[in-house]
Amino acid sequence: EAATDRFAAMINIGYLPPEEEEKLVNFDFKQVRLNPLLSKQRIIQLRAVISQGVFLHQRLGRYIQRLVAATRPYNADTDWRHHSPSELVETGVDLGASPRAIICWSRLAKVWALLQHRRAEVYPEDIQELAPFVLGHRIWLGPHAAAHGLTAEAVIADVINQVPVP
């Protein structure tokens, strides 16, 4: 789980159609010439704009923290002795999201607010829209969950529904 936790978000792009996959067999990748979309300087500028120019209210930062904490089931054998408001987490999750999810989610929320919604402030909806991408690969379901058809998506939706929006 530590390896997947290092990725900020997971986006499932699916597979190519079989006829496109067949083209990969003899494709000459050396002939591909990519043109950069952004210069290094522009990326540095955008990072500064997002970091300093997009506002994430402290109450929304706490909301992110509570959402991440709610993905973790109570475990008397560890230092995590808090019950999740989600019954799906308590019965189906073996391992919830780590604190790294908080860092990634807060940064991605700023990017999302600016690029997706053209806003200089993060709203709760931004956080909620990103939840499947930030949490999906960080929630490890137990055998009970798999046996009953529980999915990470269902757990995430329940966590979003159970944690009050500030």
Regions found by a protein language model. Name each.
Residues 4-9, 136-137:
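Short glycine-/polar-rich loops that comprise or flank the Walker A/P-loop
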